[in-house]
Amino acid sequence: EQTGADSTVRTDVCIIGSGVGGSLAASRLAEAGRGVVVLEEGPFRTPADFSFDENAALPDLYADAGMRSTDDLKFSILQGRCAGGGSTVNWMVMLRTPDYVLEEWRSRHGSEDMGPAQMRDVFNRFEREWNVGPVAAHAHSRANRILLDGCRALGWRAESANVNARECMRAGMCGLGCPYDAKQTAVKTHLARALERGARLYSETRAEHIARNRAAWTVRARSSSG
């Protein structure tokens, strides 16, 4: 959706960004019966819109056409700027937070509800919803097979990464969006469920100002059409 000039939309919850985090929140809140609005600065694209043309895809799907960096220019940041956010343009590797990291967070920051035991069910549910599983052995390239065999010959632990895909065509251009509709993105999973339950998505709409008054929060946003 897009709003007209100077229009007002009322809702229970306004979520800024439609990537993995925003879409998950939208889905859970919509399932709970809340009114949800999702603002997305970038465009809404379908598999039919994707191609392997980097000149077209980078400015369309990435923040700063894929050239975003930290202020000191030490790190580049490949940040999705489209419906689905990074899930639309990432390479699908789905890693669980290691237990030792969760334990460190708990000991340092008191995150008692995010220990390994509690997060196991969270990871399991998310992976079911996103169809996460290991890359099949036959799907590896020759280079990958050599690397796996070499690691195992040295006695090192080596496993196929888990990915979120159905019937992956192994085109090798995941960073430009999946024209085969195999990648299980936020658009296909949590955002789709949120929209089915009445959430509203405003694409090409940038949140510019957030203010709080006595009754509620106000978000001022601007669409690409002004």
Language-model segments: what does each one mean?
Residues 1-105, 111, 116, 221:
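N-terminal glycine-rich phosphate/pyrophosphate-binding loop and immediately adjacent elements
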Residues 80-170:
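Rossmann-like flavin
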Residues 30, 152, 195:
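Anion (oxyanion) recognition and catalysis
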Residues 209-226:
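Conserved beta-strand-loop-beta-strand element in the redox core of flavoprotein oxidoreductases
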Residues 195-207:
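A conserved beta-strand/loop element that lines the FAD pocket in flavoprotein oxidoreductases
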Residues 166-189:
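Cysteine-cluster motifs in flexible loop/terminal segments that predominantly coordinate metals
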